[in-house]
C-alpha cells in the first residue's frame, strides 16, 4: 500500500499579499493517508511551539526507560497483555465517554497488564502527549507511545512525555525511514515496536533485521476492519524467519476474549495489544482479568 506524503502548497506573492495554490493531488485517497497528512501538519505546529532543544533538555532530567520487552517476557499470564488507553478511533468514534486516563491506567495495572499503550494522536483518536504524561505519573509499567510517527521530533516528544517504547508503522514508512527512526529511538533508550499489516511489510522488516519486537495488526488500515486470520497467516508464513531472528510477536486489534487470545497464541504470538474491548468495559480491571483468564479461570501460562 502506497502512502503519499502531503504535497506542498506553493505560495505566490502578489503585491503585499501571499496566496497558497492548492496542489493537484491535494486530497488524501483514504483514511490512513488523511491521518499521515494531518500528522505532518501537527508536527510542524508542535516544532514551532516546543523547539527540539527544549525537548532534549526535558529528556536529560528523566530516568532511563523501562525494559518493554523484558516486561512482556516476564508476564505471569500468556500471552502478555499490552492494555491500551484509548478514548476514540476513526472507525468507532468515541469509545469511552467517561475517559479518565489515570483511573484507566490504575485499573490496568491492578488487573495484571504487562505494559500499557497510550494513544497520543489528537485529531483522530482524541489522545495527546499530555495523556501520556498523566499515565506516566500514575503507573510504573512500561509505556508505549502509539502514534503515527514520521519524524525524529515525535520520538523526542514521546521520550519527553515518559514513553519507554514507540510504535513505528511499516505502512507509512520507507525502509530508510524505519532504519533511521529506529536508530534515533534506540539513542533515546526507546524500544521500537514495528507494526506490519501484510506479507510485504513483514518481509521488509525481516530483510532489514535487528527488530526484536514486531506487531501484526489485524486491522486493515484502509478500511479499519479486523480479521485475526492476518496474524495466523503471517505468523505461519514467516515462522522460521521470526524464530531465527528471535522476534517477540505481538498480535494487535480485533481481540475481544480469551478465545481470541488462545487463537493467536497458538500460532506464536507471545503478546497481544488490546484497546477497544477493554475500553468498552464498565469495570476495566475486571474486564482485563476476564480477558486474560477466561470463563474457566485458566490460561496458557
From Swiss-Prot:
Molecular-function GO terms, alphabetical: indole-3-glycerol-phosphate synthase activity; phosphoribosylanthranilate isomerase activity
Record GO biological process: L-tryptophan biosynthetic process
Gene3D superfamilies: Aldolase class I
SUPFAM superfamilies: Ribulose-phoshate binding barrel
Transmembrane portions of the chain: none
Keyword Translocase: no
Listed pathway(s): Amino-acid biosynthesis; L-tryptophan biosynthesis; L-tryptophan from chorismate: step 4/5
Catalytic activity: 1-(2-carboxyphenylamino)-1-deoxy-D-ribulose 5-phosphate + H(+) = (1S,2R)-1-C-(indol-3-yl)glycerol 3-phosphate + CO2 + H2O
Protein's recorded name: Indole-3-glycerol phosphate synthase
Organism name: Prochlorococcus marinus (strain MIT 9303)
Taxonomic classification: Bacteria, Bacillati, Cyanobacteriota, Cyanophyceae, Synechococcales
